[in-house]
Amino acid sequence: EDEFGTLYAAFDNMRANLRTQISEAETAKQEAEAAKEQAQAAREDVESERNEMEALTGHLELKAQQYSDALDAAANGDLTARVKTDSMNDAMAEVGEDINTTLDALEDTIADMKAFATNVIQSSDRVNSNAERVDRASKQVSKSINEIFEGTTEQNEGLESAAAEMQNLSATAQQVASSAQQVADTSQSAAKVGEDGREAAQEAIAEMSAIEAETGETVEEINALDDELDEIGEIVGVITSIVEQTNMLALNASIEAAHADGDGEGFAVVADEIKGLAEETKEAAADIEGRIEAIQEQAGDTVETMESTSTRITEGVSTVEETVDALETIVEYTEEVDTGIQEIDRATEEQARTAQDVMGTIDDLTTISQQTATEADTVAGAAQDQSASIEEVSDSATELRQRADDLESLLDRFTVENSAGTGTDSTAAVGDD
C-alpha cells in the first residue's frame, strides 16, 4: 500500500507540474495578448508569432489533458493506457515518455505480482492436497501400527496359550495312543459282527426268494382255479337254459292234459312234478352261479394280495441286498479304520516328539513378537508426530493461500495485459481515434 501511495503522489506531482505549465502558458498568452494591445501598430509583425503561441498553447492544453486522462485511468486501475509522446514542446514530449515508462514499469510489476499470487494460490492448493493425502496416509499408518501392536499383543497371548496347549497335547498323546488301541480292538469286533450280519442277510435273501417263488406258484394255481370256475359257470348256464326249456314243456303238458279231461289226469300229475323239479333245479343252478361269482371275487382279491405280497417281497429282497452291500462296506471301512488307527498310534508317538520342538519354536516366536510390539509402539509414536507436523504444514499453506487471495483481490482492481513483462508496444495510446 505504501508503494501505491508513492505512485499516486508521483502522479499528483506530475499533474501539478502540468497544471503549472498550463498556468504559465496561460500567463504567456495573457502577456502576448497584452503585448498585442500595446503593439497594435506592429500587429502584422507579431501576428504570426501570436498564432504560433496560440497553437502551442492549444497543443500544450491537449497534451496536458491526454496526460491527465492517462494518469486518471492509471489511478483508477487501468494500467494499459499510454500517451502519444510526439509534441511541439520537447519538455512535454519528455514528460510523455516518462509517463509511458512509468506506466510500463508499473504494469509489468502488477502483472508479475498477479502471476505470483496465482502461482502461490495454485502451489498452496497443491500443498494442501498433498498434505491431506500425507495426513491420511500417516493416520492410516498410525492405525495400522496400532493394529500391529494390538495384534502382536494378542499374538503373545496366543503363543503363551499355544505353549500351554502343546504341553497338554504332549501329555495327552499317550492317552490317544492307548485309546486308539482300544478302538482298534472294537473295530475288529465290529468287523466280525458285520460279517455275521452279512451271512444272516444272505440267508434271509434266500428264504425270501423261496417265498417269492411259492407265492408266484400260488397265484398261478388261483388263476387256473378261476379259469375252471369260468367253465363251471358256463355249464350252470347250460343247465339253466335246459331248466327253462323243461318248464316250457311242463307248461305245454299241463295245457294238453287239461284239454284231454279225465284221460290226461295222470299226465298232468307227471307234468306238475317235472315243473316242480325244474324249478328246484333252476334255484340250485342260480345258487351255484352265485357261489361261483363269490369264489371268483374272493380269488381275485387273493391274487391281488399275493401279487402285492410278491412285490413287497421283491422290494424286501432289494432292501436286504442293499443291507448286505452296506454291511460289506462297513466291514471294509472297519478294516480301513483299523489300519488308520494303527497309523494314528504311530503318529501320536511322532506328535509327542514334535510337540517338544514346537514348544521351543513358540518360545522364540514369543520373544520376536515382544520385540515387534515394542518397535510398533515406537513407530506409532513417530507416525503421530509426523501427522501433527503435516497438520501444521497444511495450516500454514491454508494461511498462505488466504493471503494470496487477499493480494489477488487487491491486484484485480488493476487492468493489465495478459502476459507479464512483455512491454507495451501493442497498448493503445490515450487520444487515439
UniProtKB/Swiss-Prot annotation:
Its main location: membrane. Residues 24-48, 379-400 are annotated as: Disordered. Residues 26-48 have a biased composition (Basic and acidic residues). Keywords: Cell membrane, Chemotaxis, Chromophore, Membrane, Methylation, Photoreceptor protein, Receptor, Sensory transduction, Transducer, Transmembrane. Residues 130-366 form the Methyl-accepting transducer domain. Residues 58-111 form the HAMP domain. GO terms for biological process: chemotaxis; signal transduction. GO terms for molecular function: photoreceptor activity; transmembrane signaling receptor activity. It comes from the Archaea. Pfam families: MCPsignal. It is found in: Cell membrane. The keyword Transport does not apply. One of its GO terms (cellular component) is plasma membrane. It is a multi-pass membrane protein. InterPro entries: Chemotax_Me-accpt_rcpt, HAMP_dom, MCPsignal_dom. Residues 384-397 have a biased composition (Polar residues). Belongs to the methyl-accepting chemotaxis (MCP) protein family. PANTHER family: LYSOZYME-LIKE PROTEIN-RELATED (PTHR32089:SF112), METHYL-ACCEPTING CHEMOTAXIS PROTEIN MCPB (PTHR32089). Transduces signals from the phototaxis receptor sensory rhodopsin II (SR-II) to the flagellar motor. Responds to light changes through the variation of the level of methylation. Also acts as a chemotransducer. This is Sensory rhodopsin II transducer. It comes from Haloarcula vallismortis (Halobacterium vallismortis).
